[in-house]
């Protein structure tokens, strides 16, 4: 469950390390984002000489949350951290690698490129 001012780790090799949510997309009164939702983020920490600079405002998709996600079969899944993957204007990932597992819900949200790059889909 991600809201404005939430701090997230970056799960790709774009060069950003930490981002902060500044908007949850999908309606004017929408407050929370979960796995597969698109948010607008500001880069708070970045590696030197990377594709993404500190202070950059970008879109990102949430790939892991500490808040559990209910599945249709009655099971739940949750992760140890809140993580996102940075996106460009055409909704493709900025990085070329994804670190750590991602949730299966990304497949239904249409992020097949991220699912195929991820080492594990839970």
Curated annotation (Swiss-Prot):
GO biological process, alphabetically ordered: translation
Cited InterPro entries: Ribosomal_uL14, Ribosomal_uL14_bac-type, Ribosomal_uL14_CS, Ribosomal_uL14_sf
Keyword Cell division: no
MF annotations from Gene Ontology: large ribosomal subunit rRNA binding; structural constituent of ribosome
Keyword field: Ribonucleoprotein, Ribosomal protein, RNA-binding, rRNA-binding
Keyword Membrane applies: no
Gene Ontology CC: one annotated term: cytosolic large ribosomal subunit
NCBIfam families: rplN_bact
Family: Belongs to the universal ribosomal protein uL14 family.
Oligomer status and interactors: Part of the 50S ribosomal subunit. Forms a cluster with proteins L3 and L19. In the 70S ribosome, L14 and L19 interact and together make contacts with the 16S rRNA in bridges B5 and B8.
Function in brief: Binds to 23S rRNA. Forms part of two intersubunit bridges in the 70S ribosome.
The name this protein goes by in its record: Large ribosomal subunit protein uL14
Originating species: Maridesulfovibrio salexigens (strain ATCC 14822 / DSM 2638 / NCIMB 8403 / VKM B-1763) (Desulfovibrio salexigens)
Source lineage: Bacteria, Pseudomonadati, Thermodesulfobacteriota, Desulfovibrionia, Desulfovibrionales
């Amino acid at each position: 469950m991600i809201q404005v001012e939430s701090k997230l780790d970056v799960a790709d090799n774009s060069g950003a390390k930490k981002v902060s949510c500044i908007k949850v997309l999908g309606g004017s009164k929408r407050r929370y984002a979960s796995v597969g939702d698109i948010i607008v983020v500001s880069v708070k920490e970045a590696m030197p000489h990377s594709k993404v600079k500190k202070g950059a405002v970008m879109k990102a998709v949430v790939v892991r949350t500490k808040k559990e996600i209910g599945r249709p079969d009655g099971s739940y899944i949750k992760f140890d951290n809140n993580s996102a993957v940075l996106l460009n204007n055409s909704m493709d990932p900025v990085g070329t690698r994804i670190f750590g597992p991602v949730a299966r819900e990304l497949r239904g949200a249409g992020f097949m490129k991220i699912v195929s790059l991820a080492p594990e889909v839970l």
